[in-house]
């Protein structure tokens, strides 16, 4: 028997198999994702399978790609691939970066973007902020001016769901536009579809998201919007991600109207159904609905607790609330789950008991979010 390499850390198994049952209670999801999915969207996944090289697949894939462009208001290319948005942490780094990356870090997911780039062998400089604070565009300018390096990419997070911070990516993109050799990639996993951003107007070379957040679709697909400059950069660079390469995916779409590899067709059928609903609602109305939910939760938090993020930089899709009353967050979550069949989240990492988080995105409304806050008030005796 071959021995495992000594460089691999050996750990004990975390748990034995826990049998999945058929009788779980349904819970209404107010977590930072996945979020609620409409019954008709779930039903769309039950169509009989068909071949991923059939004309029917071309009809499906071109529909969801072009409808996504329309919804987001972009003339840039759109890629929809099976996988998590995490895939594009790797793909953007491999496609755009020769050596140097600047990552403004202000929470768990921006830090993870930096970690991914380091694992891919890139030279990463961090512009660090205390958790709860937002990235400041002028700090990016100072970092770009002060460095003797030419950064290939600035990697930003639009919506830091670990802290409930919404970073000003529009202004960040405007600053980075002054540095033509530096590309701007944005993780918008927990905000795109629920917080409008004019992608084409603000030098955003790549922006990517996942279906299970504000798009209110089942997990399993990643959406990526790619500028012509980013596409050209990958071609010039000559090396890229195999699975998430811009040239490979976009060229295959232009030639065939399909994905280069077998996709999760049932989830794409659900995507088509939900995107039709999103187009019917309209991005402006959807954005306003999310803003109304944000304002409701903020007013509620101000009455009973406090908002954790820096004022003026609060997320439009995920509220991170400071536990100023010292409630038992874990016990409150469990009791709300048990008594009301509603799920919300504790704080992230070290903030587990200091904060709690409410996902108010996707198909939620002020009325549905109020049902959760009423339940929290009841259980926590606020």
Q: Which residues fall in each region the model found?
A:
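Conserved beta-loop-alpha segment that forms the PLP phosphate-binding cup at the N-terminus of a helix
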Residues: 75-102, 106, 110-114
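PLP-dependent enzyme catalytic core of the Aspartate aminotransferase-like
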Residues: 7, 11-14, 27, 350, ...
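A glycine-/small-polar-enriched, mobile loop at the entrance of the PLP active site in fold-type I
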Residues: 24-82
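Conserved active-site segment immediately N-terminal to the catalytic lysine
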Residues: 200-212
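Conserved PLP-binding catalytic core of the aspartate aminotransferase-like
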Residues: 307-339
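Active-site phosphate-binding strand-loop segment of PLP-dependent enzymes
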Residues: 135-191
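Active-site C-terminal subdomain of aminotransferase-like
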Residues: 36-37, 212-298
């Amino acid at each position: 028997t071959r021995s495992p390499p000594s460089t691999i850390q050996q750990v004990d198994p975390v748990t034995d198999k826990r049998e999945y049952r058929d009788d779980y209670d349904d819970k209404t999801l107010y977590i930072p994702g996945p979020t609620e999915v409409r019954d008709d969207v779930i039903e769309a996944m039950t169509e009989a399978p068909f071949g991923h090289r059939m004309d029917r697949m071309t009809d499906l894939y071109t529909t969801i790609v072009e409808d996504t462009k329309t919804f987001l208001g972009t003339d840039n290319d759109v890629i929809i691939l099976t996988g998590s948005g995490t895939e594009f942490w790797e793909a953007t780094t491999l496609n755009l970066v020769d050596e140097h990356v600047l990552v403004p870090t202000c929470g768990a997911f921006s830090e993870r973007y930096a970690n991914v780039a380091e694992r891919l062998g890139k030279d990463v400089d961090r512009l660090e902020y205390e958790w709860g604070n937002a990235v400041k565009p002028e700090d990016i300018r100072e970092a770009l001016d002060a460095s003797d390096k030419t950064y290939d990419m600035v990697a930003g997070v639009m919506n830091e769901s670990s802290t409930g911070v919404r970073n000003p990516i529009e202004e960040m993109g405007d600053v980075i536009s002054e540095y033509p050799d530096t590309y701007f990639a944005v993780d918008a996993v927990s905000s795109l579809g629920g917080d409008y951003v004019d992608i084409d107007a603000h030098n955003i070379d790549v922006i990517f998201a996942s279906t299970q957040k504000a798009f209110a679709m089942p997990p399993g697909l990643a959406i990526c919007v790619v500028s012509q400059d980013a596409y050209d950069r990958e071609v010039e660079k000559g090396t890229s991600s195999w699975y998430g390469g811009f040239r490979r995916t976009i060229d295959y779409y232009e030639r065939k109207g399909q994905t280069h590899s077998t996709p999760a067709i049932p989830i794409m059928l659900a995507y088509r159904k939900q995107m039709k609903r999103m187009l019917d609602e309209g991005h402006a109305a959807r954005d306003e609905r999310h803003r109304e939910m944000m304002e409701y939760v903020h007013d509620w938090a101000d009455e009973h607790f406090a908002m954790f993020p820096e004022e003026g930089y609060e997320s439009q899709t995920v509220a991170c609330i400071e536990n100023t009353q010292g409630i038992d967050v874990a016990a409150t979550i469990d009791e709300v789950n048990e008594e009301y069949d509603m799920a919300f989240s504790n704080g992230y990492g070290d903030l587990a008991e200091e904060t709690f988080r409410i996902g108010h995105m996707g198909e939620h409304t002020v009325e549905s979010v109020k049902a959760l806050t009423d339940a929290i008030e009841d259980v926590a005796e606020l």
